[in-house]
């Protein structure tokens, strides 16, 4: 089974609205591992690793985010895989 890792940077109203919590929950639901963390500029960085189809499904979810957030922009890039345990909120 191929594993892919991607880094996402989500911009918009994504801090202080439960975005990382919902992102972690969605990642776990899709059997992904990685993390979500706030950046100093107001964006959220998300690393997700798992099956390519699940990564695509996750990316579609990130484009919308939870109802409490407003996603204005989603940047993504494939990165070298590392070992993560679970889906952490940093």
Swiss-Prot record:
Occurrences of domain Acylphosphatase-like (ranges): 5-90
Active-site residues (renumbered): 20, 38
Catalytic reaction annotation: an acyl phosphate + H2O = a carboxylate + phosphate + H(+)
Keywords: Hydrolase
EC number: 3.6.1.7
GO MF, one example: acylphosphatase activity
Entry annotated with the keyword Transferase: no
Enzyme class: hydrolase
Pfam families in the cross-refs: Acylphosphatase (PF00708)
Signal peptide: none
Family membership noted in the UniProt record: Belongs to the acylphosphatase family.
PANTHER family associated with the record: ACYLPHOSPHATASE
NCBIfam families associated with the record: PRK14426.1 (NF011000)
Protein name in the entry: Acylphosphatase
Organism lineage: Bacteria, Pseudomonadati, Pseudomonadota, Gammaproteobacteria, Vibrionales
Gene that encodes the chain: acyP
